[in-house]
Amino acid sequence: MRKTKIICTLGPATDRDGILEQCIESGMNVARLNFSHGSHEEQQKRIDKLYELRKKYQKPIAALLDTKGPEIRLGDFNDGKVNLKQGQKFSLVTNEVLGDETKAYVTYKQLPEDVEPGTRILMDDGLVEMIVEAVDETQIDCVVVGDCELKNHKGVNVPGLHLNMPYMSEKDKSDIIFGINNHVDFIAASFVRTVKDIEDIRAFLHENGGDGIHIIAKIENREGVENIDGIIAASDGIMVARGDMGVELPEEEVPILQKMIIGKVYEAGKQVITATQMLDSMMKNPRPTRAEVADVANAIYDGTSAIMLSGETAAGKYPVESVQTMVRIANRPEAGIDYEKRFYHRGRHEKPDVTEAVCHATCTTAYDLNASAIVAVTKSGRTARMISRYRPACPVLGGTTSKRVWRQMAMSWGVCPILLDEKTDVFALFDHAVDKGKCSGLLKSGDLAVITSGVPIGISGTTNMLKVVNVE
């Protein structure tokens, strides 16, 4: 069983007949809906198709809504894109106009107030660079550095600039309510800078009936990196969003920051996603570069919970092949990792709570007895996530009666989510979970399984029980 989870971004490429279904068959665990692009109508069609296929395959494919966030983007171009030459003049304007070879609309109205002659402005994840020459109230005149192509809605970055805008825009609020109404499982919060950004989203979710939705904080700028410990504590998981991070910060810092952030989130027992340009060449080519293969493998060696495909599946020529390639790459390093050695080298927390202590003991018991699987029966998913935190070698069956938790566990490293029927007796629930494990093919008669849960059942945060069973 593959332990690292795969997130696929939906878009025009997966809208084609049969493509999303093939991605699911190939190993997709989570569907990402990028609300920086596409209308609610377009996203609704994707969600409806996803939910139809989820029901058909009875698979817990989670839905992740990625917000636009407090970012700056270009508007539309007359022909969808323009080609620019080194040294030519180009203007960014705050009046909403169709772009051409001389100008483009920029969504941040206050940008002229925040830049000055000599300021570097980067676009499209740093592929396009311009230098500011002159500024007035509504227009920034620039000179283009290097031949380049600009397309609709590409991101705009000014390294080191603090955006003087509220964290949650009206668009983000509208998108999040759309997600609540469509029962998404995760919100990926773009450009998180401080703990307050997470608190604002959580309060908004609470006010609008979205309490069960988990928040993944995207770390994309220096402020987010500087506040990483608090952001990890406040959120349910972290996305290492390397595209904007590599523009906002020196690119040579990105690998170091990636390892640091993955390590911190891993230690906190939360989910961590490594994202952006993982198989970027497969946008146009059927095979990845060797450097991309090494990049994906190194993220897995670092301990990432999930690896994400962005443009590769949303708009690339080879979306299905990209998923299949991710699966093959993930399987190889996983097969070579000594998880038991890592577990004992890692040790345990000095002051664990009851759940952490029981989960650590569960993993120790599984290693000592060479168990075939760990069965974590959980109300909120926390028990399964705590087991996942210790990266056990054997599969983790995350059993829950909640459909949302069932789907959310699809992002947890090493966890195979199983949906359980409601039971009033704890031992009947354990037997039911083991039977489901047999149906999944991860358990068979004669296997040894270690079960952990909480008594009384059905109450979140009460993990206090460990049981070893011989599967009949």
Regions found by a protein language model. Name each.
Residues 1-472:
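Non-catalytic helical/linker scaffolds that mediate oligomerization, partner binding
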